[in-house]
């Protein structure tokens, strides 16, 4: 890890930061903050952080490579403005294990995705924990505001922090969720924003939750259900009836249900649900990508995908490479050819449209 008593940094190294997600209900996970102090028995993230932390003792000796601050409650927090790397130049993803860490260099990653995605913010942390400085959260929210093509999904066990920080609620792409694992957690939904997009994650489902006529279903836009995973001796496998009662009540209230793969052994493939709210089905694109993919029909002026139109090319002398100067939709291209007595060329795209 150390070279001459100091951790090496590599500004160009941006690996292991924003990944195509293995979490079924989102496209990407974005982890500008890692680490958590909830100490949940079933936490998968803690185990992952321990696997990819390197030698924490040596990492902490590289004091020039990170900053330290205290939370409002007095806990030690770490700040990385650049990724910490080992002697081979590879990023140490969690150099302080599961201790709360702000990876500031990861803040710009949503800008690198040109197509709109459903991004789970903070899969390796609870970014709304009481120990997380308000300034960290505001920096993350500011990035979300500046990159509105994505849907941002937040999940916490401390939803009252949503109200403490006055999160933006009048935007369709900001989704605020809370985790409910047992009957004692039900009250958490009361702290979700009064308006805006709200969801709950019942994962892991640890006991029977009274779902029938529960007012929570009047307030949420989506529900995710999953079972505890891993090999813990204390692992709880939910009963099928616990799951189906939640699903049935969600159906009665027209709340989309997403069931994670961990439920397949319990309910069976045929009973699995992969429902998404409408707002998470629509993919937006950046202005730069829009200009790359779309253009105006030269004749009728209708905007369409370039791939669905005929490219117009011209050259002034034989042997010159033709230059593209515009596009024309299939119908307009046919009319154009007829109008000028030009034989309509046999193009695959036009033949496919005729066959359809």
Question: Model features per residue range: what roles?
Answer:
Residues 47, 304, 336:
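Cys/His-rich microdomains that often coordinate metals
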Residues 6-174, 183-194, 212-213, 217, ...:
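Conserved Radical SAM active-site core
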Residues 37, 41, 298, 330:
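Cys/His/Pro-rich metal-binding microdomains
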Residues 2-28, 52-55, 206, 210-294, ...:
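Auxiliary Fe-S-binding modules of radical SAM enzymes
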Residues 44, 301, 333:
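Cys/His-coordinated zinc-binding microdomains
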Residues 51-53, 307-310, 339-341:
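Short Cys/His-rich "knuckle" micro-motifs
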Residues 323-347:
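Short metal-binding segments enriched for Cys and/or His
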Residues 294-322:
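Short recognition patches in nucleic-acid-associated and regulatory proteins
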């Amino acid at each position: 890890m150390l070279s001459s008593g100091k951790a090496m940094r590599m500004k160009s190294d941006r690996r292991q930061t924003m990944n195509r997600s293995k979490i079924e209900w989102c496209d990407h996970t974005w982890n500008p903050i890692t680490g958590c102090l909830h100490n949940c028995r079933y936490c998968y993230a803690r185990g992952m952080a321990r696997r990819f932390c390197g030698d924490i003792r040596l990492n902490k000796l590289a004091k020039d490579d990170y900053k330290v601050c205290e939370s409002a409650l007095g806990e030690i927090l770490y700040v990385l403005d650049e990724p910490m790397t080992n002697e081979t130049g590879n990023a140490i993803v969690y150099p302080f294990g599961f201790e709360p860490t702000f990876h500031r260099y990861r803040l710009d990653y949503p800008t690198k995705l040109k197509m709109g995605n459903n991004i789970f913010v903070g899969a390796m942390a609870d970014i709304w924990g009481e120990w997380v400085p308000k300034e960290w959260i505001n920096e993350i929210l500011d990035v979300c505001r500046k990159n509105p093509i994505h849907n941002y999904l937040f999940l916490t066990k401390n939803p009252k922090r949503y109200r403490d920080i006055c999160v933006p609620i009048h935007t369709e792409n900001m989704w605020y969720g809370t985790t409910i694992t047992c009957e004692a957690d039900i009250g958490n939904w009361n702290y979700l924003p009064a308006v805006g997009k709200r969801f709950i994650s019942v994962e892991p489902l640890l006991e029977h939750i009274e779902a029938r006529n529960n007012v929570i279903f009047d307030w949420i836009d989506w529900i995710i259900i999953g079972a505890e995973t891993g090999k813990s001796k204390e692992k709880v496998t939910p009963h099928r009836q616990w799951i189906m009662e939640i699903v049935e009540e969600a159906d009665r209230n027209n709340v989309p249900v997403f069931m994670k793969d961990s439920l397949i052994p319990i309910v069976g493939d045929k009973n699995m649900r992969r429902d998404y709210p409408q707002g998470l089905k629509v993919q937006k694109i950046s202005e730069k990508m829009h200009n790359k993919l779309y253009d105006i029909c030269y004749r009728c002026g209708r905007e369409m995908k370039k791939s669905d139109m005929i490219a117009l090319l011209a050259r002034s002398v034989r042997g010159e490479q033709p230059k593209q100067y515009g596009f024309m939709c299939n119908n307009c291209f046919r009319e154009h050819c007829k109008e000028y007595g030009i034989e309509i060329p046999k193009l695959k795209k036009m033949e496919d449209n005729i066959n359809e």
